[in-house]
């Protein structure tokens, strides 16, 4: 059903607000990570969504992340793996901070958000983690597949000379679309960016199944499994 809704435009329009919002939440999260206050919203003027931000960095937000990272490191100080992960995250953050890499992360954060939410919803559908009633599981799985299929559909539409590609290249509100900007930053062709999107979207599906098979090790299981 998710496949049908994805590849039939009229039907995909019905649930498109969900994909739009998770896309904008992705941008919002990355903006906040780098200290830019932002709010996800629907764009009623030009269609789709928009992430509202004045792109003025807030030093207090950056310091809040730093303090949080230090506090988490202190709390988990006896777990070497956690400390290594936090150290790697801090190095990656400073490597990207206030650079073209930061701009790239913000630009592609929307598509990363779609893939992350799609994988998370699929994981919840497979495991029942966080579900109160059994009916939630197929709904989460449906939403996960719908978001991921939608991401793949966009990537596939940009590989050839399609009408969707023509409209995508027009941008929105005088601003280039995310993959166009990302390709320019990376000095890639748009088709290469589209292939990367397809690859990471496809990767999210088996990754969700692998994570589900390791759910007890991860610690994110359904309530019924918690006491087993």
Predicted regions and their residues:
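Membrane-interface helix caps and helix-loop-helix hairpins in membrane proteins
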Residues: 97-106, 131, 157-158
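Aromatic-anchored segments of alpha-helical transmembrane domains
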Residues: 4, 88-97, 143-155
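Cytoplasmic-side transmembrane-helix entry/capping segments in multi-pass membrane proteins
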Residues: 77-90, 107-115, 133-141
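Membrane-interfacial alpha-helical segments at the cytosolic side of multi-pass membrane proteins
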Residues: 32-37, 68-72, 116-126
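Active-site scaffold of zinc-dependent metalloenzymes
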Residues: 1-14, 28, 32, 66-75, ...
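Membrane-interface loop-to-helix entry segments
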Residues: 53-64, 104-119, 192-201
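Small-residue-rich helix-interface/hinge motifs
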Residues: 6-63
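C-terminal membrane-associated helical module and adjoining short loops/tails
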Residues: 122-228
């Amino acid at each position: 059903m998710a496949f049908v809704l994805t590849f039939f435009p009229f039907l995909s329009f019905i649930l498109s607000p969900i994909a739009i919002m998770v896309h904008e939440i992705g941008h919002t999260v990355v903006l906040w990570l780098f200290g830019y206050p932002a709010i996800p919203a629907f764009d009623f003027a030009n269609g789709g969504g928009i992430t509202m931000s004045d792109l003025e960095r807030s030093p207090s937000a950056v310091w809040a992340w730093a303090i949080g990272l230090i506090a988490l490191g202190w709390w988990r100080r006896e777990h070497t793996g956690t400390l290594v992960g936090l150290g790697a995250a801090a190095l990656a953050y400073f490597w990207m901070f206030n650079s073209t890499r930061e701009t790239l992360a913000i630009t592609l954060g929307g598509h990363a958000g779609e893939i992350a939410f799609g994988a998370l919803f699929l994981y919840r559908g497979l495991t029942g983690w966080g579900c109160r009633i059994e009916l939630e599981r197929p709904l989460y799985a449906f939403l996960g597949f719908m978001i991921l299929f939608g991401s793949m559909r966009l990537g596939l539409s940009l590989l050839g000379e399609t009408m969707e590609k023509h409209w995508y290249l027009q941008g929105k509100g005088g601003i280039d679309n995310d993959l166009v900007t990302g390709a320019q930053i990376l000095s890639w062709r748009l088709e290469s960016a589209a292939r990367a999107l397809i690859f990471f979207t496809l990767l999210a599906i088996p990754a969700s199944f692998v994570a589900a098979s390791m759910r007890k090790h991860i610690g994110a299981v359904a309530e019924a499994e918690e006491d087993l």
